Amino acid sequence: MLHQPKTKATVGRLDAETVNAARVRGPLYEKRRKIFPKRAEGRFRRFKWLVMLVTLGIYYLTPWIRWDRGAHAPDQAVLIDLASRRFYFFFIEIWPQEFFFVAGLLVMAGFGLFLVTSAVGRAWCGYACPQTVWVDLFLVVERFIEGDRNARMRLDAGPWSLDKIRKRVAKHAIWVAIGVATGGAWIFYFADAPSLMSSLVALDAPPVAYTTIGILTATTYVFGGLMREQVCTYMCPWPRIQAAMLDENSLVVTYNDWRGEPRSRHAKKAAAAGEVVGDCVDCNACVAVCPMGIDIRDGQQLECITCALCIDACDGVMDKLGRERGLISYATLSDYAANMALATSGGTAAIDPSRVRNAHGAFRDKVRHLNWRIVFRPRVLVYFGVWATVGFGLLFGLLARDRLELNVLHDRNPQFVVESDGSVRNGYMVKLLNMIPEQRTISLTIEGMPAATMRVAGQATGDGRRVTIGVEPDKVTPLKVFVTLPKGRFAEAEEGFSLIAEDPSSHERDVYQANFNLPGAAGR
């Protein structure tokens, strides 16, 4: 006879019903059924607390971090300066023409999600998605004011009283305050945070600031406090996308019914009567803690965000009963299928725990458990390779880029001017981009067309081939440049010429190959 483990404690059954069970499904546009998730305790809940604290801390505090870039640049560590068209990230400064770096980061983010999903399933949804993080934060407030699951259910079902009004007003007021803080933190990324905060308090900030805060306050309050799981189930496309990205070796939260079935609320009596029972005592703890209101025992479901709180709840019950943890666990579908085949004799019989346990109650050697090496399979490595390649490419581009650029635009009307002595002059609009927060002296040189001379409007003439120009820090300096080729030397224009901008101190340089237009048949 299969050995039955000693029961250390009795486990009560929680009154919890899933929102998506077939027996409770109503019309397509049914009124939302409130979910009152019970607080869970365990390793995954602690990890979620850590992720929540880190992500919220980064979001709310980052705009207030200072970073000294000198006297000619803002000192906010992370700043999206739309007015100056700059993006600052600590020691990195991105100009508009370098937006491909931002595009590269978006590509990395996309492949990062593919990588995480392929390796560990919907971990993004369960731990780091903003919707998940803010819902967790709102639930902390709700539990603090109204109590845990049973107390909240009683309060919701009870009649209106002064105590109920007090608790509801306090809860919603804090939720609105969180929404205001969320909207305020967002706009601080687009302006100097201390200055904008002073303007907001003094009520003289730009209207767009108040509008943005209002919109984000409303969305945070509605999504995090009122809609919650409905955002994930009905509004977010990511569950549908991820469904196509998972395979039989992806980690998903799984109810191991090969050891849990048949369920029994009275395992001792059933065993004494010779009945076959599994480890699940049908306590509904996994349903009570689920923020999505589902029963993981019903199998893989679109609503499951793999937050693993049901694992913590079930592990706690197994500890009380003196049984092995892992009745609900992270597992791969391939391992699950193999264990189910073992428990059902290849699918030809009902689940029998004696097929997966020996006479002493221990799991048989054929039972497959999670092997973390499955994470490093070819599909995951390919995603990681693409992700790392893009990352190294961006890093190399950032380290190797010059902070001096030369942009040249040839005059179109007129394309050339014939002077009284027969020489031909072409005009060019030149822009020098000094992409560091320091003033520099740039040497602008013409190379090629040996007989040609160059003149820069408003600048000292120099030797006719080279002009020294002072450029402001972190600015674009526009210049009007005229290049003149004397009569009799027009043949030199066939090869054109080069404009070279160079910083003698850092030896940074940029070169532009320009054409020189001539009148008549000689022009090009």
Swiss-Prot record:
It comes from the Bacteria. One of its GO terms (molecular function) is 4 iron, 4 sulfur cluster binding. The chain crosses the membrane at residues 99-119, 173-193, 207-227, 380-400. Residues 272-299 form the 4Fe-4S ferredoxin-type domain. InterPro entries: 4Fe4S_Fe-S-bd, 4Fe4S_Fe_S_CS, Cyt_c_oxidase_cbb3_FixG, Electron_Trans/Redox, FixG_C, Helical_ferredxn, Ig-like_fold. It holds the Pfam family FixG_C. Keywords: 4Fe-4S, Cell membrane, Electron transport, Iron, Iron-sulfur, Membrane, Metal-binding, Nitrogen fixation, Plasmid, Transmembrane, Transmembrane helix, Transport. It is a multi-pass membrane protein. It is found in: Cell membrane. FixG is predicted to be involved in a redox process. The four proteins FixG, FixH, FixI, and FixS may participate in a membrane-bound complex coupling the FixI cation pump with a redox process catalyzed by FixG. PANTHER family: FERREDOXIN-TYPE PROTEIN NAPH. This is Nitrogen fixation protein FixG. The gene is fixG.
